[in-house]
Design a protein with these regions (language model features):
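Conserved helix-loop functional segments at active or binding sites
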Residues: 1-7, 43, 61-64, 93, ...
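An alpha-helical support segment within catalytic cores of ATP-dependent transferases
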Residues: 1-21, 31-35
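Catalytic activation segment of kinase domains across protein kinase-like and atypical kinase folds
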Residues: 12, 26-67
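Secondary-structure capping and boundary motifs in well-ordered enzyme cores
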Residues: 15, 20, 47, 79, ...
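Active-site capping/gating regions of soluble enzymes
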Residues: 23, 30, 83, 107
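Active-site activation/catalytic loop segments of kinase-like enzymes and analogous catalytic loops
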Residues: 52-96, 113-132
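All-alpha amphipathic helical-bundle segments outside canonical DNA-binding/catalytic cores
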Residues: 99-111
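ATP/Mg2+ or Mg2+-diphosphate-binding catalytic cores
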Residues: 117-176
Length: 176
């Protein structure tokens, strides 16, 4: 699972494009009156890369109603497929002009991979004494890792639903 996107890039299946690098919910500017996303902020991580990392991270962040800091409630974490549909509809409605067939092919993988990868990063940091991610208490990064692993489990549980959402949106060009 860990190499799926990099392998696709190496095989020439996914092109490099400009990516944000940290498109979590906190980095999306929301218009106060409409509640609509109007801009992405915090541009210090912009670079050439695979847009799948951005899409996966955005969905990881935006489809976990309990958030990254669910802490001891980590067992209640789930992937919200309704949020997934809404986010992907909005994204694809704007990005359809440059998305290629393989972009859609690897969307599910990107969603699952980013949650799993972040879980590994939090867990590794916990084992190393919380030296990378700031921790409010000794088990903070352990709980953060459990949140991401539970989210990964939920993403895998909803695999068929997520793939159907992607297929529906692609067929309707983001207009579902």
């Amino acid at each position: 699972m860990a190499n799926v996107l990099e392998d696709a890039k190496t095989k020439g299946e996914l092109p490099l494009r400009i990516m944000h690098g940290d498109p979590k919910v906190n980095n999306i500017m929301i218009e106060k009156d409409t509640g609509k996303a109007i801009s992405i902020i915090d541009l210090d991580t912009v670079k050439p890369g695979l847009i799948h990392y951005d899409i996966g991270d955005c969905l990881r962040s935006g489809c976990n109603p309990l958030g990254e800091e669910a802490g001891v409630k980590w067992e209640s974490v789930y992937f919200d497929t309704n949020n997934c549909r809404s986010i992907l509809q909005g994204y694809i409605s704007q990005a359809k002009s440059f998305l290629i067939k393989n972009d859609y092919k690897y969307l599910y993988d990107s969603i699952r991979l980013i949650a799993f990868e972040l879980g590994l990063r939090f867990f590794t940091d916990y084992l190393e004494g919380n030296v990378y991610f700031h921790a409010e208490y000794p088990e903070h990064n352990l709980f953060r890792s459990l949140v991401q692993f539970k989210l990964t489990e939920s993403i895998e549980f909803y695999e068929t639903d997520i793939k159907n959402i992607i297929k529906d949106i692609k067929e309707n060009e983001g207009r579902c």
